[in-house]
């Protein structure tokens, strides 16, 4: 069954097909949205604030999943977020917009390291103190430990 295969691709169980929407966590709902988008075999996916409502550890899991899917399916993402640490984590190139206009554009790492615009600096300073890259490392370690046990 195609729906079950899509759920498995986003690290959910086929049994989840029989659940009601209110029975899912925020992270599970986000995975379902990803599975739905994959159903049409897209070349690119627009992710608009796709992890902003999730706690940071679940954000890291969903972002890792998106990265894995990108490699497996050769996907391109347009990633929209006010959290520049998320954009830096996901994107090779970054465009910072203010009032509907691009005020800064370039490699994500370079912009994050030395932003030219005051607005960009303000966004970076507003980044949550939890570092997504450290959380990704912890999630990877935890997954490795689980796999070692199994």
What are these regions (language model features)?
Residues 20-24, 28:
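Conserved ABC ATPase signature
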Residues 34, 62:
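Hydrophobic anchor residue at the start of the ABC signature
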Residues 39-43:
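A short, proline-enriched helix->beta-strand linker immediately N-terminal to the Walker B motif
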Residues 87-89:
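A short, surface-exposed alpha-helical micro-motif characterized by mixed small hydrophobic
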Residues 102-106, 114:
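ABC ATPase "signature
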Residues 113-150:
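C-terminal boundary and immediately downstream tail of ABC-type ATPase nucleotide-binding domains
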